[in-house]
Amino acid sequence: MANVVVVGAQWGDEGKGKIVDWLSEQADIVARFQGGHNAGHTLVINGETYKLALLPSGVLRPSKLAVIGNGVVFDPQAFLDEVERLTKQGVAISPENLRVAENVTLILPLHRELDALRENASKATSIGTTQRGIGPAYEDKVGRRAIRLMDLADIDTLPHKIERLLTHHNALRRGLGLSEFEAGAILKELTALAPRLLPYAETVWRLLDIKRREGKRILFEGAQGALLDVDHGTYPYVTSSNTVAAQAATGTGMGPGSVGYVLGICKAYTTRVGQGPFPTELDNEIGRKIGERGREFGTNTGRPRRCGWFDAVLVRQTVRTCGIHGLALTKLDILDGFDSIEVCVGYMLDGKEIDHLPAGEGAQARVVPIYETIEGWKEPTANARSWADLPAQAVKYVRRVEELVGCPIALLSTSPEREDTILVQNPFEA
């Protein structure tokens, strides 16, 4: 298959950044297709740490074209700040190697403020958003009142579009007892940003179609994880976009038949940030040990991640909803030294055994994991680059994961460094 889609197979933070960076060496184009600057990637290249939030990981590789698709919500200031920060680290970024869909929805200060107001209003209604305006921006997109990048090229019609947007937002603010936003201030800000943003604007669907017809390889980079999908995730503790693999087509303008091989990324254990159900969560010393070893803190927020054993039920479910062809298993080295390792193979719900996570919030909270115990290993897996480097028991663990989720392991990651990767099946050649 000429193209590859990379998606998180859990709740995000699975190590997609490293895998995308590793695969991007074989790709011509790396395209983001959903989310915003709420989901960060940390990449370690030759000892240098790079933190990305909005930009595709492909920007770190010279000669690759990076693309931000229409399915993304785009914060102009966050974009400019990230470009500036990476430029200071020696990364060359310009309209020559980075294009942004002209019809991408913009995140404005009013979106960030509304997000924070909702999240901080009550602990009872908090779902753990990053308060970066992602959800409110998607709401405006669906409500057909969003400001898009292309609108900055037509300053004459922009005031009308801002007024349409404020008809909604100022009504909300009046209800909250807050002062209203002024259209003139927003117009001034967007007018000032336009010359810095418009050089990146592109008709992305057309660009990608041309490149596809030329035989170029496209790598579609997802953010977050499939269990945060607004339809297929643990609703309402989800993000505001579709994070499953099918969104790669919708979020870039490519046809579904053009997406190609679907590679799911999952950790050898499970983590989650924020609120929501987590059947295998370990609120004990083992969970803290995994978190410390794995340095489980959010790239963007710094929030500690909740940690637990590998949940084969959830990953198997994601394999189905995303149509995953192969998995990349990351952070196997974090499990080094455990005498035994637990893997969730099913759930008990109200006295009955089930093989999937139910859609209802109440039922999700009541499921109890059924565990299978697997013998651990003492020898290190860290920095392994071939199957021969792995302890026999670690190989057995990987093989058992394959059996339980019904999907082969295509890649195995044993450290944050891009070279510490074991290739089983090349997604671009599958």
UniProtKB/Swiss-Prot annotation:
Disulfide bonds: none annotated. The keyword Mitochondrion does not apply. Keywords: Cytoplasm, GTP-binding, Ligase, Magnesium, Metal-binding, Nucleotide-binding, Purine biosynthesis. It catalyses: IMP + L-aspartate + GTP = N(6)-(1,2-dicarboxyethyl)-AMP + GDP + phosphate + 2 H(+). GO terms for biological process: 'de novo' AMP biosynthetic process; IMP metabolic process. Binds 1 Mg(2+) ion per subunit. Mg(2+) binds at residues 13, 40. The active site is at 13 (proton acceptor), 41 (proton donor). GTP binds at residues 12-18, 40-42, 305, 331-333, 413-415. It is found in: Cytoplasm. IMP binds at residues 13-16, 38-41, 130, 144, 224, 239, 303. Its cofactor is Mg(2+). Pathway: Purine metabolism; AMP biosynthesis via de novo pathway; AMP from IMP: step 1/2. SUPFAM superfamilies: P-loop containing nucleoside triphosphate hydrolases. It holds the Pfam family Adenylsucc_synt. The keyword Ligase applies. Belongs to the adenylosuccinate synthetase family. This is Adenylosuccinate synthetase. It comes from Rhodopseudomonas palustris (strain BisB5). The lineage of its organism: Bacteria, Pseudomonadati, Pseudomonadota, Alphaproteobacteria, Hyphomicrobiales.
